[in-house]
Regions:
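Flexible, acidic/Gly-rich N-terminal and inter-domain linker regions that tether
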Residues: 2-85, 390, 398, 406-430, ...
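Conserved, mostly hydrophobic/aromatic
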Residues: 77, 90, 129, 186, ...
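Canonical Radical SAM [4Fe-4S] cluster-binding loop centered on the CxxxCxxC motif
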Residues: 80-109
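Conserved AdoMet/S-adenosylmethionine-binding subsite of the radical SAM
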Residues: 112-117, 135-318
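Alpha-helical ds-nucleic-acid-binding substructure associated with the helix-hairpin-helix region
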Residues: 290-293, 307-345
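C-terminal extensions
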Residues: 325-355, 381-439
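Residue-level signature of tetratricopeptide-repeat
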Residues: 373-374
Length: 439
């Protein structure tokens, strides 16, 4: 073969080989990115890492899959599976063993190179990696750890890495994964063990909770070591998260929220994600016959989750024994206020911060501003609007200079207040039927 412009035949052979290899990798990418889209537990990263000279990537940046840093900035992640081949046959999963779908598997080296290539082209700023279970949990986990280790040690990748821990993986592999990952997660999937065994007979709560405990031990031990040694290695500094599927089984919202509350009691659990059940396997008679995912219910659970995390509500207050399912027409905070008119009206010029948080239309930021502002002046409707209070809701539950008793939830009755607040919403939903509104 003749040399062209100083290039040897070996050079062109290598070029053809690399082109063929990349085409194969991209075919795998199409299959495995599609298989990964049903995992929602990567909406926030919760970490910012400092860069060092020579490092590649960053956890901080601006809008693949989007996540958010601790300071609220958006980063894009390569959301991918190492393989969608799986030995399990979970009823709710598109990648179940018995499904006839396109299958693919990356080698750890291929996925490492793909991640770096995507980063260098400014497509991504991090990696969210999950996998089907091949052979056994330890074999799969070891290959996932190899990807994270090579990214950190060989390529000096400093971007965000979220690793899904495989249920049943050994403590040694979970410990090694935590040294390279920013966040780790183990999906609970089904909120009760009885239904988990029904839909995923190969799994158990023990195999799920055990890796959770390993992660928690690693995070707490790392935090203790860093109090004594400044440069001690960090272990999953953004903590851990989990995900539950909503609507695949008969659990009540109360059951789901009580489980979430117990998970948040763990010191390293940062987020619980709720995924509306998508009927990807309609032929399985163990699953409910749904036309579409229960998006409104999913949204209400996220709102209830927010109330538990930031507003001081308990799970058994949001969904009690008499109302174990969340109201799909109104948000959980308003539903609680209408069930408990005895707590209202609240005088915004005197009420404590905790009670202000329970008023519909008042958020965390607004409550703080109210407490600060009333030191210097008496608050009025206008000043509350300027602070950011949603007066359309709050007017029925508060007292201020212009709002006095006589027009609140107790005088108008909760049923009437509910009708007044939901009438505009019904008109909007009639115009936008089928579209879930965000506000």
């Amino acid at each position: 073969m003749r040399k062209i412009a100083g290039r040897s035949p070996v050079f062109f052979e290598k070029k053809r080989y690399l082109a063929a290899m990349k085409a194969t990798v991209l075919e795998k990418f199409k299959v495995l990115a599609e298989s990964a889209k049903y995992d929602v537990s990567c909406a926030s990263s919760g970490v910012t890492r400092r860069s060092r000279p020579g490092d590649v990537g960053s956890t901080a940046g601006w809008g693949i899959c989007h996540s958010f840093t601790a300071d609220g900035r958006c980063v894009s992640l390569l959301k991918i599976m190492l393989t969608n081949v799986c030995i399990y046959d979970c009823a709710y999963c598109i990648n179940r063993r018995s499904n006839d779908i396109p299958r693919a598997a990356f080698t750890p080296g291929e996925l490492t190179e793909l991640t770096i290539e995507f980063f260098r082209r400014n497509y991504i700023e991090g990696l969210f990696l999950s996998s089907g279970v091949v052979r056994n949990p330890d074999y799969t986990m070891e290959r996932m750890v190899r990807v994270a280790r090579d990214l950190r040690t060989v390529h000096r990748f400093n971007g965000y890495i979220h690793l899904k821990s495989i249920p049943g993986a050994s403590p040694e592999l979970v410990a090694e994964a935590g040294r390279y990952a920013d966040r780790m997660s183990v999906n609970i999937e089904i909120p009760t063990e009885r239904n988990l065994r029904l839909l995923a007979p190969d799994k158990s709560y023990e195999s799920i909770y055990r890796p959770m405990s390993y992660i928690q031990q690693g995070v707490l031990q790392s935090a203790e070591e860093r109090t004594r040694f400044r440069h001690a290695p960090r272990f999953a500094p953004a903590g851990q998260s989990t995900q539950m599927i909503v609507g695949a089984t008969d659990e009540r919202d109360r059951d789901i929220l009580l489980l979430s509350s117990s998970l948040y009691a763990r010191p390293t659990m940062k987020r619980v994600y709720y995924s509306g059940f998508i009927p990807v396997n309609p032929y399985d008679k163990r699953l409910p016959a749904l036309d579409k995912a229960p998006l409104v219910r999913e949204n209400r659970l996220y709102q209830a989750d927010w109330l538990m995390r930031f507003y001081g509500f308990r799970a058994d207050e949001i969904a009690d024994e008499r109302t174990p399912r969340l109201d799909l027409e109104i948000d959980p905070k308003l539903a609680w206020a209408l069930r408990h008119p005895e707590f209202f009206p609240v005088d915004v010029n005197r009420a404590d911060y905790e009670m202000l948080l329970r008023v519909p239309g008042i958020g965390v930021k607004s409550a703080r501003l109210i407490v600060t502002s009333r030191r210097y002046r008496t608050l009025t409707q206008q000043s509350l609007r300027q602070i950011g209070v949603v007066m359309k809701k709050a007017q029925y539950f508060i007292l201020c200079r212009e709002l006095t008793s006589g027009q609140g939830v107790n005088e108008l009755r909760p049923e009437q207040v509910r009708r007044l607040l939901t009438a505009p919403q019904r008109r909007r939903s009639d115009k936008n039927e089928g579209q879930l509104t965000l506000f």
